[in-house]
Amino acid sequence: MTATRSPDEVQHGAAPVPGGPDPVRRTPLSRLVPSSTNPWTGRGAFVAFAVVVLAFPSLAGNSADARLWAEWLCYAMIAVGLDIAWGYGGMLALGQGLFFGLGAYAMGMHLSLEQVPDGTLPSFMSLYSNYTELPLLWRPFQSFWSTAVLAILVPTLMAGVLGLLVFKRRIRGPFFAILTQATAVIFVLLLVGNLKLTSGTNGLTGFTTIFGRNKYQPGTNRWLYTVAAIGLLVVLAVAMKVVRSRYGKLLQATRDSEDRVRFLGYDPAIVKTVGFMIAAAMAGLAGAIAAPVFGIVSPAQFDYVPSILMVCWVAVGGRGTLWGAVLGALVVNWARVTVSAARPDDWLYLQGLLFVVVLAFAPGGIAGLLRSRSQWLTALVARKRSPIEGTSLEGAV
């Protein structure tokens, strides 16, 4: 006969059953994070999205459209990672441009070396420096595979170091946001100040060939779009796995109450640092793919202003919903291009107004509005199908 305990004994940490596990360690995370059946994270939605995204190049009107959408898909990757940090972990990071820039510069350095014969320096080094051989910093980027690894590994490790330093000191909220923003500014200043190594404000340009393909060859933009689409699908799949895992529940519990998580025997600083590292890795991957898509890698692309815009994408789409982050990035950037083409001077005002309206009237973002509408329609259908007017389905059964 198995001994049992009441729910109160489990919740309040009563003495363990002889031979049983420690109740503090075994307290289910579901008590801290309510379970939900969220259609936005379903596998069916992922498969449908994958089919549409991968089929888009054949539907695009021209190659330029494919390149533009490839850029937006890279932004969506950043938004998904930021949603894990902010939406699920409660870490408002205003410096994701730092990790995006690290990935982009890593791939940009490789592409710069691809444009010149082996043993030859990039053109800007010959102009701004007296180097006679390739600097040590640039040598790992001669190989594509080492570049691909470093584009993800360097941002991840930097986020790990920064996260431990910050979260171990229990810095959070606006202080964490300001610190991450300051870190992004420092990164940009380093890029601008090292003219001999990074080409300063000019950035890395002149990518006429991309991984052996002519940049202006028909089909190159569609090929880059396919790479960006696969990258986004990988990021989404990983993100879904993370948020559904035990760690994902722990991350959400940390967001809601660090003290409770600490009582369960976990270190909130480690939990948050891992989430921050995941977001940085996704931003680094996005940057590595974005470099050939942009055709230029410049410090202005990774300053504090783009970092703030990344937060706007997640807020507009709906933080705490991965699909909302993707939707927000795509919708906001589509609106930017559309409005800027018609009224180039008005977009910044409209963007600010959009952000204010969302925060004031739709804090759940687009995804929250769609979810509430879906729930309202479901309830309406349930009432109409109920045999007794005003009775729910559960009461009718």
Question: Residue locations for each model-derived region?
Answer:
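Transmembrane alpha-helices and adjacent helix-loop boundaries
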Residues: 2-397
